[in-house]
């Protein structure tokens, strides 16, 4: 914007203040700018008449004009000096900035630069007024009279352009070209006549040239550019008529520049005085023989260029320095530099000028001037005549003007200058253009510069600001006429022999651009872009000119110059054919080139110029033919020419980069990167074309008269059918021999980068271009991880090596794809496990692997267990043993089982295969010397059948493998979203789920409305199966439910008023229990009713639904679910509700009850329960149960209850508004029914805890019976004498209410079993993970990452048991343990952090403050280990819910094989009771809070075993993880072992544990007389190795 603001300004004639063009008044004095000269309007009106003149009339007018003009010039010479002084005085004062420090030294008149050169050299600066984008322009539209005040130059009413709008200089040239369009239409006939009379025209032309030369010398002192008057002739060729818009110029390279290397012009000095910077005086140029002299305007212009100069200092405060540098860069090694800058059309000229060195340009033009004299002396005379008749502006050499391309042209009233137009170029492109060389030397020693100015004799009128609207309308009208003229000219060229020398391009209408600024958006490398663009155009024109350049060398040179001129005029059409209303930001450099082909006009112009300069008629005809062919080719390319010359950048996706550019215009990425992509696309296209051609050829070669068989359905079709008449299959695909392109197994290799399957013969991936890696590296990269830490490939390769050459040879013929298995044994440098078994085939080794544990694995494992426990020791062999190794794959194990079934021992197999090959035997002997114990990781000798340290048998590995496979099968079913999660705000999760549920509900409502139906839930229909487990027996006698009614059909005591509502300020007293024994749910609802917001969160549908569809959000077994129910409720024969209801005709109680019944299967499933279950279901919050009885503890404890601690917990829970419920007479309490009834209590009943108070030393609790009646009758009852007036007013201000009572804390401890607390919090985060409680191992293991200290609640849920009857229910014992861990990659059990109680309940939980660290969560359950569940889909499911005050990261991982044993050992060491049985031996017992017993023995002896006998046979209602209640084990030295884990079987009944521990020291691992021979554990621990395997003391 800086450069543009420097030219969009005008000088006040009164005070010389510089004002921006947008302002119509002077900022300083208020003088109104003059914009309507009357003389210009008259000239404008005359311009419209000029266009209609013929060429003959124009010639006569030119001759008359010359005589009149010479008479007038003498009179004008006297006043010329005063006129140009007046003009430049105002310009100089406007452009000069007077510095404050030198204002007193500034002369009053700055016209004479000689008097002020010292001051000018030191203080002249170009004043630039910075643009104000928010400046509003106020002007009156001349068309409709609207007073406009906006930033645009267009009227808001009629869209008329303002007469004040600035315009570009190119629009002036376009206007002149259109004015001459009519007069030049018949010029072809005149030119043809000139060729037929060369002598006559030579004499006439020579006379005019002499007069022109005399007038040229005289016009050097008159400065015709400043004359206001102009002849009415529109096409006169006299030198006196060649006045135009005058632009001040500067010599950018002729002086010693400032430090910044920038210069410009401001003031004017006449050519009679010496130049203030020692510029040479202009001398009359010698006239060469046969060369037409340059017009007066040309010399005058060059004289002014030498006499005009200004100096601009570097302005450090100028904000447009970067833009100035770009402007000056285009002006290097050039003479003339105008303040009225060109637009982007000058880019091509500037670039073309830079292509040639200055000396080369001089020599080229001199040669072009001399060659026509030598070869064709008559042609210059003819051309002299024609040159005077034609506008000379077409010969403007690009080396003369290098003008910045960023800017606009401001039309000054009294200035004019010749411009090249499209019409003048097209009409004169068939002539030689001889340029007068005027060489001058300056003080800087620059090279000679060609000044090829030509006087313009066109009749184009001056363009002023008030002509903008007329010009726009005239351009539109002239477009159609020029298009018709182009067609007529093409026909004349093709038909007329005399017109063969003409090949002018069709003139294109040029639309002016108004008020469009900052057109060049890309300033960087614009000279290079322009140069490349011009080079491309010259190349295109040179191709046509080569056809005729052999006979005349000048033809080629003229063709090149002509192409530059044509590209200049064409660029005006291309660049300025946009009518811009307002400036909408910088345009891209290639924006105007999208719809135009820049090579079209240049090629035509070059061909025509070459043809015109050729004497041979045959060469001319050839050139015309070449031009016509070029025109025809270009017509076919115009449609896609822009896209075919563009390339797309793969880095930034910019699609309009010109083809000749080496870098992207947007991101400057190199175009070399596109070559590979283009080549690839070409190859693909060629392949597709070849394939298509091949198919067509085969179809053509196929016999036409024979039937063909469809490949899809095998139907024989007639030969005339092109598709199968049955299945529509293609005939071409059926008869062709082209196979399917899909690569089959063994015919491809997989890319390691993009996983694309490529053909084997392709060394490079066709997608990512990655090279194919060697087979060995590919095999190494595809290492698959085993559950036990090693890879399948390691033991596969080891199996091949152990098997020797026979195994390798047998598998080599079956494997097609190259793998590591069929490579030479010496090249496969893979790590070998200690002992491996051979495989039959490599294909079987890879193909039979499966994650499922049910693949005929268990029978063989059982056989192995029996053989290992029998004590039979196989025959020793140096190459192997009879026990299945630890590191063996599934396929290897299957092969091993197959070999066992054939009666072949593994030892003999290894021996036989090892003898097959020498290399194989060596590999087998080196890899089987030792084997690693899976229990203690000790490397044992190959001859040992049991571990030398822990005495674990080799067969233990098979059990470990089966356990790992089971874990893997379960883990495969988990999705990545289930494995790794992040905790989220509970409120956000609720809103998200409600939004999803609302969409489903709206669809149902819309369906019901469209069909005029009421919603009926078919998944929970109004039928007996929704009431009972067994509908047949339950629907018999005593069934109170007779019918199902909707709310408006239910009979109520209050009648029809008030209407039914979902909520009416829910209160605990509104709940009324029905005949169903679901007090646990209603007591939880009563607690929820204390907080209305919690009740409304449960019911998603909070308003009455006319269609009867409601949604309830519940948390079943730890997982949130939205339940959809209808409003059909069970009623008796009188129409009253049978089950729970709410007073005041509210629906929230029966609807919630029905939703809970639906998720559990039926209403009968709601019978009996605990309030904590109801609270967890309704809120989903973590819950805790505080036992109030010693018998309620999970394990009888000698410690008494801490009553004060319990009371403190109740008080604190009430303070934070936790929800609480009390269980009366439940659990293991001994209940006296009569005593409870006398006290007003119901045993096995749930009550709501409404308040907890410690007042005046009394500990009181406020309870409520869900029945709404039957209250407490003991101490602190409503009629108790313990109440004082103060206490009654404080605690019962509204008096007694039915079902609500106060009771002392002591009575609660006596009559109640426990108090359940629901920890409802706001602003907490939650995450819920789903897992499986697999028997015989621990599968639910979670890695927890705490990023900042947080308070956390952990709750482990199991699947609900209410879906089945009580007799079929069996709950698991649950426990969740939290450990610290060090490495997240390989987590191991660390220090114990916290654990929950192990209880046989629906869920257990614990609470802990966690620091920033990594934790390991282990979920435990034991009482289902020996239930015989084999189907993984029948394994019990669990959900781990984690609530935290801060956000957490959780990830489900696969536990290590011994993680369960390490967890129990760590837990027992921390929480268990320690018993020193003997020296070096310690026994640990874990009973408290464990719902069973854990016995763990530690052997600290270094070289002695400890035999331990544990007898628990007197216990009842417990189960053992060993499968038996009596165990015998041999604990190795320096190791610990979990001996037995006893678990409560039924949670409702009590249990008893009696254990007796006997131990002794031994010098060997065997049990001797305590067990079978050779046994170390009885019963064996293979099935439970993960829990009962000995572990090293760490």
Swiss-Prot record:
Residues 438-459 have a biased composition (Low complexity). A zinc finger (RanBP2-type) spans 1-35, 135-164, 643-673, 704-733, 744-774, 927-956. Disulfide bonds: none annotated. Residues 215-229 have a biased composition (Basic residues). PROSITE patterns: CALPAIN_CAT, THIOL_PROTEASE_CYS, ZF_RANBP2_1, ZF_RANBP2_2. Residues 246-255, 371-385, 528-541, 860-871 have a biased composition (Polar residues). This is Calpain-D. It comes from Drosophila melanogaster (Fruit fly).
């Amino acid at each position: 914007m800086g450069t543009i603001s420097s030219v969009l300004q005008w000088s006040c004639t009164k005070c010389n203040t510089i004002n921006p063009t947008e302002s119509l008044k002077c900022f300083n004095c208020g003088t109104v700018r003059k914009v309507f000269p009357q003389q210009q309007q008259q000239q404008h009106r005359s311009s419209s008449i000029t266009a209609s003149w013929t060429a003959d009339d124009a010639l006569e007018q030119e001759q008359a004009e010359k005589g009149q003009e010479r008479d007038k010039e003498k009179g004008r010479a006297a006043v010329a000096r005063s006129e140009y002084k007046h003009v430049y005085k105002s310009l100089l004062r406007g452009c000069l900035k007077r510095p404050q420090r030198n204002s007193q030294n500034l002369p009053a008149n700055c016209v004479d630069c000689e008097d002020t050169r010292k001051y000018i050299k030191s203080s002249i600066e170009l004043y630039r007024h910075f643009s104000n984008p928010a400046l509003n322009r106020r002007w009156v539209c001349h068309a409709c009279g609207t007073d406009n005040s906006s930033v645009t130059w267009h009227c808001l009413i009629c869209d008329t352009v303002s007469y004040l709008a600035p315009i570009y200089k190119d629009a002036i040239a376009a206007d002149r070209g259109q004015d001459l369009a009519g007069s030049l239409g018949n010029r072809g006939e005149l030119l043809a006549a000139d060729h037929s009379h060369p002598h006559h025209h030579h004499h006439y032309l020579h006379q005019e040239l002499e007069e022109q030369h005399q007038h040229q010398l005289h016009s050097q002192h008159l400065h015709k550019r400043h004359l206001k008057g102009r002849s009415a002739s529109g096409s006169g060729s006299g030198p006196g008529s060649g006045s135009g818009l005058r632009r001040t110029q500067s010599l950018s390279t002729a002086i010693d520049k400032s430090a910044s290397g920038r210069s410009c012009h401001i003031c004017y000095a006449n050519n009679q005085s010496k130049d203030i910077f020692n510029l040479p005086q202009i001398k009359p140029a010698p006239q060469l023989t046969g060369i037409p002299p340059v017009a007066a305007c040309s010399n005058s212009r060059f004289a002014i260029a030498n006499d005009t100069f200004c100096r601009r200092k570097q302005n450090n405060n100028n904000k447009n320095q970067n833009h100035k540098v770009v402007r000056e860069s285009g002006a290097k090694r050039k003479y003339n530099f105008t303040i009225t800058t060109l637009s982007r059309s000058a880019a091509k000229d500037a670039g073309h000028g830079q292509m040639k060195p200055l000396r080369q340009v001089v020599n080229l033009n001199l040669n072009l001037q001399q060659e026509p004299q030598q070869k064709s002396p008559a042609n210059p005379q003819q051309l002299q005549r024609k040159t005077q008749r034609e506008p000379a502006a077409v010969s403007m050499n690009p080396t003369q003007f290098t003008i910045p391309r960023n800017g606009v042209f401001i039309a000054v009233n009294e200035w004019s200058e010749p411009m090249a137009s499209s019409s003048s170029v097209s009409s004169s492109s068939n002539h030689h253009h001889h340029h007068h060389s005027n060489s001058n030397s300056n003080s800087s020693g620059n090279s000679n510069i060609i000044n090829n100015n030509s006087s313009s004799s066109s009749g184009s009128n001056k363009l002023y600001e008030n002509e903008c609207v007329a010009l726009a309308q005239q351009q539109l009208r002239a477009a159609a006429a020029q298009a018709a003229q182009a067609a007529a000219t093409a026909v004349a060229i093709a038909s007329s022999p005399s017109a063969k020398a003409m090949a002018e391009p069709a003139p294109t209408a040029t639309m002016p651009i108004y008020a469009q600024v900052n057109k060049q958006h890309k300033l960087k490398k614009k000279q290079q872009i322009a140069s490349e663009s011009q080079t491309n155009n010259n190349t295109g024109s040179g191709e046509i000119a080569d056809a005729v350049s052999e006979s005349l060398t000048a033809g080629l040179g003229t063709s090149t110059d002509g192409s530059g001129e044509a590209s200049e005029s064409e660029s005006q059409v291309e660049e300025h054919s946009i009518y811009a209303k307002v400036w909408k930001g910088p345009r891209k450099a290639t924006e105007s080139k999208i719809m135009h082909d820049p090579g079209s006009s240049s090629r035509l112009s070059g061909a025509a110029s070459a043809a015109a300069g050729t004497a041979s008629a045959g060469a001319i005809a050839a050139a015309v033919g070449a031009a016509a062919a070029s025109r025809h080719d270009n017509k076919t390319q115009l449609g896609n020419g822009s896209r075919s010359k563009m390339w797309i950048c793969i880095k930034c996706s910019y699609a309009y980069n010109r083809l000749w550019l080496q870098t992207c215009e947007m991101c400057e990425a190199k175009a070399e990167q596109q070559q590979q992509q283009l080549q690839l696309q070409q190859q693909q296209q060629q392949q597709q074309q070849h394939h298509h051609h091949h198919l067509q050829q085969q179809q053509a070669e196929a016999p036409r008269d024979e039937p063909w068989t469809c490949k899809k359905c095998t139907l024989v079709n007639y030969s005339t059918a092109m598709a199968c008449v049955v299945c529509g299959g293609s005939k071409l695909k059926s008869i062709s021999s082209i196979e399917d392109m899909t690569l089959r197994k063994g015919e491809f290799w997989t890319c390691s980068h993009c996983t694309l399957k490529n053909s084997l013969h392709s060394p490079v991936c066709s997608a990512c271009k990655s090279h194919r890696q060697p087979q060995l590296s590919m095999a190494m990269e595809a290492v698959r991880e085993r559950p036990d830490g090693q890879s399948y490939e390691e033991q596969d390769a080891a199996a091949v090596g152990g098997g020797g050459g026979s195994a390798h040879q047998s598998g080599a013929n079956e494997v097609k794809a190259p793998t590591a298995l069929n490579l030479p044994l010496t090249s496969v440098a893979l790590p070998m496990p200690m002992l491996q078994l051979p495989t039959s085939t490599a294909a079987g080794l890879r193909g039979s692997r499966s994650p499922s544990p049910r693949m005929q694995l268990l029978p063989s494992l059982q056989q192995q267990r029996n053989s290992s426990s029998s004590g039979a020791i196989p025959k020793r062999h140096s190459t192997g043993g009879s026990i299945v190794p630890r590191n063996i794959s599934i396929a290897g194990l299957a092969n091993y089982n197959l070999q066992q079934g054939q009666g072949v021992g593994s030892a003999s197999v290894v021996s036989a295969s090892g003898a097959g090959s020498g290399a194989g035997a060596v590999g087998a002997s080196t890899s089987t010397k030792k084997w690693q114990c899976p229990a203690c990781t000790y490397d044992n000798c190959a001859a040992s059948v049991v571990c030398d340290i822990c005495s674990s048998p080799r067969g233990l590995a098979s059990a470990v493998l089966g356990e790992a496979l089971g874990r893997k099968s379960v883990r495969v079913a988990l999705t990545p979203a289930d494995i790794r999660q992040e905790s989220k705000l509970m409120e956000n999760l609720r809103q998200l789920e409600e939004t999803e549920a609302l969409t489903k509900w709206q669809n149902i409502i819309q369906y019901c409305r469209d069909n005029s139906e009421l919603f009926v839930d078919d998944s929970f229909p109004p039928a007996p199966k929704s009431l009972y487990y067994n509908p047949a027996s339950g629907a018999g006698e005593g069934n109170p439910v007779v019918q199902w009614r909707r709310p408006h059909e239910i009979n109520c005591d209050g009648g029809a008023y008030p209407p039914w509502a979902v909520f009416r300020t829910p209160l605990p007293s509104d709940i009324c229990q029905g005949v169903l024994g679901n007090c646990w749910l209603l007591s939880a609802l009563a607690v929820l009713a204390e907080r209305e917001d919690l009740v409304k969160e449960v019911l998603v549908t909070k308003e009455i639904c006319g269609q009867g569809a409601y949604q309830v959000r519940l948390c079943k077994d730890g997982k949130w679910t939205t339940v959809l129910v209808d409003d059909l409720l069970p009623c008796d024969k009188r129409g009253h509700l049978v089950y729970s209801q709410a007073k005041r005709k509210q629906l929230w109680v029966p609807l919630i009850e029905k939703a809970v019944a639906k998720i559990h299967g039926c209403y009968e499933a709601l019978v009996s329960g605990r309030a904590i279950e109801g609270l967890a279901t309704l809120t989903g919050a973590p819950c805790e149960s505080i036992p109030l009885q010693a018998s309620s503890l999970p394990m009888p404890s000698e410690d008494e209850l801490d009553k004060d601690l319990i009371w403190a917990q109740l008080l604190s829970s009430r303070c934070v508004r936790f929800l609480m419920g009390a269980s009366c007479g439940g659990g293991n309490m001994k209940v006296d029914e009569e005593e409870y009834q006398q006290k007003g209590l119901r045993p096995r009943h749930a009550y709501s805890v409404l308040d907890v108070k410690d007042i005046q030393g009394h500990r009181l609790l406020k309870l409520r019976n869900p029945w709404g009646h039957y209250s407490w009758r003991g101490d602190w009852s409503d009629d108790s004498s313990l109440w004082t007036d103060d206490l009654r007013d404080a605690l019962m201000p509204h008096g007694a209410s039915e079902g609500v009572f106060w009771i002392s804390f002591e009575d609660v401890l006596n009559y109640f079993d426990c108090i359940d607390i629901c920890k409802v919090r706001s602003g907490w985060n939650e995450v819920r993970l789903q897992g499986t409680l697999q028997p015989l191992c621990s599968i639910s293991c979670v890695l927890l990452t705490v990023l900042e200290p947080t308070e956390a609640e952990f709750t482990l849920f199991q699947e609900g048991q209410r879906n089945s009857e009580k007799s079929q229910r069996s709950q698991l014992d649950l426990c969740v343990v939290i450990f610290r861990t060090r490495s997240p990659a390989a987590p191991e059990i660390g220090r114990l952090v916290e654990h929950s109680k192990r209880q046989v309940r629906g869920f257990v939980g614990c609470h802990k403050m966690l620091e920033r660290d990594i934790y390991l969560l282990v979920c435990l359950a034991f009482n289902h280990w020996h239930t015989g569940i084999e189907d993984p889909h029948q394994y019990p499911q669990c959900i781990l819910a984690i609530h935290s005050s801060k956000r957490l990261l959780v990830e489900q991982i696969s536990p290590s094989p011994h993680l369960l044993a390490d967890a129990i050992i760590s837990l027992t060491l921390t929480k268990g009771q320690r018993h020193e049985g003997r020296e070096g031996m310690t026994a640990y017992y874990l009973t408290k809070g464990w719902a069973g017993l854990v016995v763990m023995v530690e052997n600290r002896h270094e070289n002695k075993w400890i035999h331990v006998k544990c007898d628990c046979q007197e216990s009842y209602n417990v189960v053992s993880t060993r499968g038996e209640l009596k165990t015998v084990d041999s604990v190795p030295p320096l190791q610990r072992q979990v001996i037995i884990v006893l678990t409560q079987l039924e949670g409702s009944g009590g249990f008893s544990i009696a254990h007796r521990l006997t131990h002794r020291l031994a010098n060997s691992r065997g049990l001797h007389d305590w067990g079978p021979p050779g046994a170390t554990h009885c019963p064996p621990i293979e099935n439970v190795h993960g829990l009962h395997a000995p572990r090293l003391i760490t």
